[in-house]
Amino acid sequence: MIRQVIGAAALILIAAPAFANPCGFDERGRMVVTGYAVGQTTIPGDQKAKLAEFAETAKFRTGICVFAQVDKQGSDAANERVASGRAENVRQYLLSQGVKADAIRIGKQEEAFTFFGLLSSDQEDDRRVFVTHN
């Protein structure tokens, strides 16, 4: 039992940075844009309503953080391009919804990448963009 508790605590400590906000502020709200195909940077159509709803609150915030994750496929350079493209497309969408440009920050990509998934279904979950506000 003690080993299990220690193991769970260690896992939490290891995984915590992956879930931390890379823009450095306390989160008051968060949403996740999911459904990206491999290599796709365009926001999936079924996610735009959810993102627009988030933008309604985000318009009144001073800190918006956008950071993208990718799956294990592709080279580091390709994954960085895809993650940057996803984050930038979400940023542009938020701007189109009236969120102030100076409030939006793109999180550092190396802090946002987490590759927990081993199965193909897990890798689908890894292809996402987190959007948070203070």
Please provide the spans of the model-predicted regions:
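Short, surface-exposed beta-strand segments enriched in small/polar/acidic residues
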Residues: 51-84, 105-114
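Short, conserved glycine- and acidic-residue-centered signature motifs
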Residues: 44-47, 79-87, 124
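Periplasmic OmpA/Pal-like peptidoglycan-binding modules at the C-termini of bacterial envelope proteins
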Residues: 21-26, 31-34, 38-40, 54, ...
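Sec-exported extracytoplasmic/periplasmic mature domains
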Residues: 56-63, 92-100, 134
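Bacterial N-terminal signal peptides that target proteins for export
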Residues: 1-7
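Cysteine-centered nucleophilic/redox motifs
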Residues: 51, 66, 82-97, 131
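N-terminal signal peptide c-region/cleavage motif recognized by signal peptidases
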Residues: 15-17
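Second-shell loop/turn segments in exported
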Residues: 34-44, 71, 75-80
